């Protein structure tokens, strides 16, 4: 049976990738359908109740700068906000928020239900309609066919999902949800490279059974940070603390004594788990010299008693989970509400993707989220936004777009995935970016909002606020440049008290702000340089741009040099064995990867600068390079 409407873009899956993909496509004016197996789970936080963190918060800010939903949702659902690395430089500062799961999910659903150009439909997808290597639509479990010009798959851990608790296993996409078996089988028929990954979640605890009097409280920041560039502290619900406890030698003894009942150590689980979020049994065995691990006790919301013990993800049997939990301080009488478990699922080698998230083998088919081997809500949201945008552009027969590595962490993400692939769940860190001084949380809008507006992702309200911020910054910098003080000026004594060494020559406000000991707040407290900007975001930008001007200029110069051949196209049908001078190893890697540009080719492991030079000569020879460009 054929559905009575045709769509421009279909998004399959309503998690963090799917919601951003559907909204991005709809925001650009394309008729979009979001298919989910259960509308009640739209925007559900399947694992930890938190958004942000090192590297991850940067992605959330970038998604927000391009009109995405995640930052606004957490601003309305966050019950504790903190700035991580607050004492360090601006490049590595990151925002993190605990979420009320129910508030977060409700905000996402409300936003989706009221989004123009977006239709929701509850049905699991079992098959793709593919004709002559181009996707034409999907077929649902009940046999209903939907046609579209582009399809985005954001299926999370549902493809061939298998849940493990001890030596028992069952099929499932997550606890309480069925897996997607038919679609997994269908995708395995297509020419994609497929493998298995694993992730896990800890048992949930009833807060009424915990003795908080012996636990260390961890409070959020005051004033609370805000995630969205459109956000406000008044959007935040009531703020509450988290708590800290620790495992101990008794905990570790319980784990060691029961490893034979662990599906990981019994060889039942074959998928590789996340390196930076290991299970408690993995931590105990890998770090045998440590007799204690810190566990963060995170409330799941304002209207529930459930607690999320961050740090004891496990797939050990339930009776062992009870022993582990009750061995920890404050948890001696703890009641487990939901058992922890591990889940194995299919993922597809992201080297089979273009930089637009379109698959190389099926035109119009896009992948986003855990299907690409990533882990984390934030990584999923970033991929979803870009895949939804590019599916929209594809449906309009327009050229796709993806940010470069020097423009966004979203660019680092797709570049890493599509050039290097991954053998384990990929997580974003600031250390993955070569130009992280330019890719700060605070300037995500300055980097991306103008381009997002051009692409149709940014509405008038966000655009107006962005332009007001730019105006405020420019006017304030001009004011500080043109305001001077000299050793004879009124107020010099007050100024000198703020300086390490007294001022001995005339200086502008910008000159003084460049001094390491001087802050914008201190400078504008002086009568000569008052008043300070009311726009705190613009004020922060003024201070960072002035203080780090030299370093920023140096990184920009480095980027300019490295971009000479970044976008030089490589023919899709080029047989690299025809290129004289390339080694057999390089030929094999290039023929396998089929990189779209020289820049992408240069980042494939084993591709040397000499090989890139040979490719430049070959491109000139076949007329795809302008004379002199190979020496540019």
Swiss-Prot record:
Domain of life: Bacteria
Residues noted as binding FAD in the record, renumbered to the chain: 13-18, 125, 180, 370
Subcellular localization, as worded in the UniProt entry: Cytoplasm
SUPFAM superfamilies in the record: FAD/NAD(P)-binding domain
Chief location bin: cytoplasm
Cofactor(s) demanded: FAD
Disulfide linkage: none
Cellular component GO terms, alphabetical: cytosol
SMART domains, sorted: GIDA_assoc_3 (SM01228)
Positions bound to NAD(+): 273-287
One of the GO BP terms on file: tRNA methylation
GO molecular function: flavin adenine dinucleotide binding
Keywords for the protein's UniProt record, in alphabetical order: Cytoplasm, FAD, Flavoprotein, NAD, tRNA processing
Claim: Flavoprotein is one of the keywords in the record: yes
Quaternary state and interactors: Homodimer. Heterotetramer of two MnmE and two MnmG subunits.
Function: NAD-binding protein involved in the addition of a carboxymethylaminomethyl (cmnm) group at the wobble position (U34) of certain tRNAs, forming tRNA-cmnm(5)s(2)U34.
Name of the protein in question: tRNA uridine 5-carboxymethylaminomethyl modification enzyme MnmG
